[in-house]
């Protein structure tokens, strides 16, 4: 049976050209005033493809070092002007595309404009330990995303009214301590995109998108942990191990109103397989968390005045988790990370 809407024409071809004209210029200066450091700049952007727009974007970064506490505080602001992806933008903006299905919504895609804020600190402890923490917030108008032509891999840019993304992150570094080095990092983030859509092509039923409300951003991963420890066994030999924990990204699942949720899920099993579906939490609309372990070992196998040869062995995803990164929904495709993998690398420097 066809996966396409019955009203979709069987043949479709499109050819179009248009110059993408973009210019930018910026000035920036770095100022040191005692324990203060200030970086300030101003950028101008011009975008001309299907629309003609200009933007002036200031940026500012301020930091202060407190010698008695071995502490650095910093704050930054950046005004961002992001042009739409040009992938298939002529196709999605064409009259031919609107004839693919009835009830199609087509709007011009304007550049995204955002205000990015960040504040944080960096502090050293016991000479061999460094802690870094940051809080960030990003407010974006005409938030850029991408969509697909029915059940194909053809993608094109779209935009929503706005997005608000905020979170915090911290990292503990041990640069060198009795042959040990490593880090442990944690990040927490929340991202929401807000209706209505303000740009792009939405075929058929996709044109019936809500005019208000919000949904999780495609990168709204609440908790992420990374860690790695390295030990220098000898002057020419080292070993390392790492961990990776992700709480899972959100997805949007469309279930036919004539079917129950379980019937819809069973249909997904036939399409993607039981192993993939077992990694999906349909009740929460998120992929289940994943935990992975990695390990590495390296050695300098030959070293002379003119030549150095090193051998490295890596093992990735040793827990062999079926790592579903993205799951198909209204605005995204599927992505699955590699299974347990091993790599051997021989490098020569001369």
Feature-to-residue mapping (PLM):
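Membrane-embedded beta-barrel scaffold of Gram-negative outer-membrane proteins
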Residues: 65-66, 73, 88, 108-159, ...
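Transmembrane beta-barrel strands of outer-membrane/channel proteins
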Residues: 40-46, 75-79, 88, 133-137, ...
């Amino acid at each position: 049976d066809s996966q396409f809407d019955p009203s979709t024409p069987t043949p479709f071809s499109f050819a179009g050209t248009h110059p993408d004209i973009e210019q930018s210029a910026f000035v920036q200066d770095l100022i040191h005033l005692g324990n203060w450091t200030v970086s300030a700049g101003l950028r101008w952007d011009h975008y001309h493809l299907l629309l003609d727009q200009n933007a002036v974007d200031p940026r500012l970064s301020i930091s202060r070092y407190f010698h008695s506490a071995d502490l650095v505080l910093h704050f930054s602001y950046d005004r961002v002007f992001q042009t739409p992806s040009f992938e298939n933008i002529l196709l999605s903006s064409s009259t031919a595309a609107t004839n693919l299905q009835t009830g199609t919504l087509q709007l011009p895609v304007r550049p995204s404009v955002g205000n990015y804020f960040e504040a944080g600190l960096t502090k050293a402890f016991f000479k061999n330990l460094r802690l870094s923490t940051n809080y960030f917030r990003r407010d974006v108008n005409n938030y850029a995303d991408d969509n697909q032509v029915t059940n194909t891999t053809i993608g094109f840019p779209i935009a929503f009214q706005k997005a608000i993304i905020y979170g915090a992150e911290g990292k503990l570094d041990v640069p060198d301590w009795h042959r040990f080095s490593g880090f442990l990092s944690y990040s927490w983030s929340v991202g929401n995109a807000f209706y209505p859509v303000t740009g792009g092509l939405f075929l058929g039923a996709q044109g019936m998108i809500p005019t208000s409300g919000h949904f999780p951003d495609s990168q709204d991963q609440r908790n992420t942990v990374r860690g790695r420890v390295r030990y220098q066994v000898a002057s020419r030999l080292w070993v390392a191990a790492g961990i990776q924990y992700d709480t899972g990204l959100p997805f949007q699942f469309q279930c036919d109103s004539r079917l129950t949720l379980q019937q819809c899920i069973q249909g997904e099993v036939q399409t993607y397989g039981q192993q993939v579906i077992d990694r999906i939490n349909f009740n929460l609309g998120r992929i289940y968390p994943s935990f992975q372990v990695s390990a590495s070992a390296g050695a300098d196998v030959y070293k002379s005045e003119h030549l150095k040869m090193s051998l490295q062995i890596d093992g990735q995803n040793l827990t062999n988790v079926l790592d579903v990164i993205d799951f198909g929904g209204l605005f995204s495709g599927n992505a699955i990370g590699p299974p347990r993998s091993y790599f051997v690398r021989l490098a020569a420097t001369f």
